[in-house]
Amino acid sequence: EVTFANIWGVCDEDAYDKVIRSLGERADTTAVPFFAHVMTVSNHRPYTYPAGRIPIPNDAKLRSGGVMYTDYALGRFFEEASRQPWFANTVFVVTADHCASSAGKTEIPLEKYHIPALIFAPGLIAPRQVDKVVSQIDLMPTLFSLLGMDYDSHFFGQDALSDDFRERAFVATYQDLGYLEGDVFTVLSPVNRAEQYRISPTEEDRYNLVLEEGIPSQELLDRAISLYQTSSAWNTRP
């Protein structure tokens, strides 16, 4: 049942109610483990959502309202999911599919790309906080490691909980490709243009970028190019 929708689709609560019903039906009819991918849309412009759920009016059309409603609906989902027989044997991964904006003072403003990520499985995975530079591409290898899966990896990502984990991140816009390793951020742009920035944290911005003269680290530039070329070749293979 759809109780609220906008140009993007149904509100998060309606989507989660459908998930609860669908997973319940799946669990009732088969003993085979299942995988579900859920995409919610309320945290998108025009940021409209059902009235009376949060303190910010549903017609205010504020990003903060979209975020608050997203949080509210997610909490409601976990509350309902915790009552289901499949909850105790399920691992939940929550993250954003992209950042809110890529506009800033530099080609790729790193502070805009900081998104949340959560792996949640009470009773299966002990709570902890990972204070490392981790990319979306690291989520699957990390999850597979937590599940104890044995597999041949073709991932670019790594297990973020491994002692051998190397902190790095891939970020991009429609025009530029970025590669962060250590405190050096390499940006590849059209027409063979490249720039490197050094992270110089400030009180306001832990990822403040300072443009370097020339290319101080040819090694990191070569690595960025090779990684993106390898990815492109793999994705366009016959």
Residue ranges, per PLM feature:
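Solvent-exposed soluble domains appended to multi-pass membrane proteins
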Residues: 1-238
